[in-house]
Amino acid sequence: GIACVTSDVPPWTTYSRANTQIHVERIREERHFGSGASSVTIGLADVTVVRQVKEYERKAETGEVIDVVDVDMPPTELYTQAVYYHVDPLLFHHFGIAEQDVPGALHAAEHAAIGMLPLLVGCDRADIGGLSTPLHEDTGEATVFVYDGYQSGAGYAQRGYREMTTWLRTTRDAIVACSCEDGCPSCIQSPKCGNGNRPLSKSGAVALLGALSSVLGDMPDAAPDQALNPTPSVR
């Protein structure tokens, strides 16, 4: 297509909003911990990330949203690798997370994990992306994905999987250490969130990451060959 543009410096900026879906193509490695209400699964998989921009919002210099404009954009697909965890729905109740806070807890934990991973694996925040959902069609449970933003993967998800225990624990510690009350760009807000950083629950993320650390316990991070030479399965 052809776009006509003009040079201008308006008193507002635009932020896109996008829908993202992740389809699990092949599970490379999975580990299961706990049982019943404390059941947690962590894994590494080949995935297809489908992203489609649906609208954008105009924000004034004060941060106030002026309006939201619908757009008709084609979806984009990325075949890559993702590290993930999914949990039994009862885990939230078991660890004191209210049902209405579950989406925000997952979303905030995802954002914080994306912010922390570069410190562990040496990537940039822009090199990775994520998705959280209270119910994923492939796992059948509440799930958080963090994926490489490059075709066929770049190794960041693999390293995140190998260092999952340290990653989750340090992510929780970073949120707790932040002095804000309800979440800020230093802990759970993301500059590239396609949902406008909504919903987010700082307390829910702390409780969720604490629950994961509790279930995983003193599990050592995986040795490199555990993640790089897995027994694959297909969904």
Can you name each region flagged by the protein language model?
Residues 1-178, 197-212, 216-219, 224-228, ...:
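Extended Lys/Arg-rich polyanion-binding regions
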Residues 178-187:
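Short cysteine clusters
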Residues 190:
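Cys/His-rich metal-chelating microdomains
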Residues 193-194:
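Short, non-ligating residues that shape and space the ligands of small metal-coordination modules
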